[in-house]
Amino acid sequence: MTRILGIDPGSQRTGIGIIDVDESGRSRHVFHAPLVLLGEGDFAQRLKRLLHGLGELIETYQPQEVAIEKVFMGKSADSALKLGHARGAAICAVVLRDLPVHEYAATEIKLALVGKGGADKVQVQHMVGIMLNLKGKLQADAADALAVAITHAHVRATAQRLGVNTQQAWSRKR
């Protein structure tokens, strides 16, 4: 059994999703939640909260692998920079604990879950719910984090079948 932590980074809310994957490649939901950073003071204090909060979750749930969504250029350059800082704080929390980090673009995640790189958030949330047998509507940030974890589980299973590392498997899938 392998435990995978998925992270959907954000400067106001960071999605956290944790799954267990068995030897056959089946995924089981363990935990999901948004790590809310608003109200934590200035931006630097929010990054500190992200670093420490994510570190606590890693210590509690003990994942073996971590997958994180790559930065995309959104509304403005300022937003993209803040997202990059949040992503950096999240990656630091992971590598400080000597865990491997695997990165996936939003289009790669959508392709892995829905079959279309241009799928919308509702389609991704729906597929996450089906794949993990979750009832009710998932909160967007947490659903995205679970989607990142599921994507990594799929890439990981493909890599094992091909006898290559995950980076090589993903480049062959596309």
UniProtKB/Swiss-Prot annotation:
Domain of life of the organism encoding this protein: Bacteria
Molecular function via GO: crossover junction DNA endonuclease activity; DNA binding; magnesium ion binding
Binding-site residues, Mg(2+) 2: 69
EC number: 3.1.21.10
Protein's UniProt keywords contain Glycosyltransferase: no
Pfam families in alphabetical order: RuvC
Cofactor note: Binds 2 Mg(2+) ion per subunit.
Binding site for Mg(2+) 1: 8, 141
Spans traversing the lipid bilayer: none
Cellular component GO terms held in the UniProt record: cytoplasm; Holliday junction resolvase complex
Subunit structure: Homodimer which binds Holliday junction (HJ) DNA. The HJ becomes 2-fold symmetrical on binding to RuvC with unstacked arms; it has a different conformation from HJ DNA in complex with RuvA. In the full resolvosome a probable DNA-RuvA(4)-RuvB(12)-RuvC(2) complex forms which resolves the HJ.
Job of this protein: The RuvA-RuvB-RuvC complex processes Holliday junction (HJ) DNA during genetic recombination and DNA repair. Endonuclease that resolves HJ intermediates. Cleaves cruciform DNA by making single-stranded nicks across the HJ at symmetrical positions within the homologous arms, yielding a 5'-phosphate and a 3'-hydroxyl group; requires a central core of homology in the junction. The consensus cleavage sequence is 5'-(A/T)TT(C/G)-3'. Cleavage occurs on the 3'-side of the TT dinucleotide at the point of strand exchange.
Family annotation (PANTHER family): CROSSOVER JUNCTION ENDODEOXYRIBONUCLEASE RUVC
Protein name: Crossover junction endodeoxyribonuclease RuvC
Gene encoding the protein: ruvC
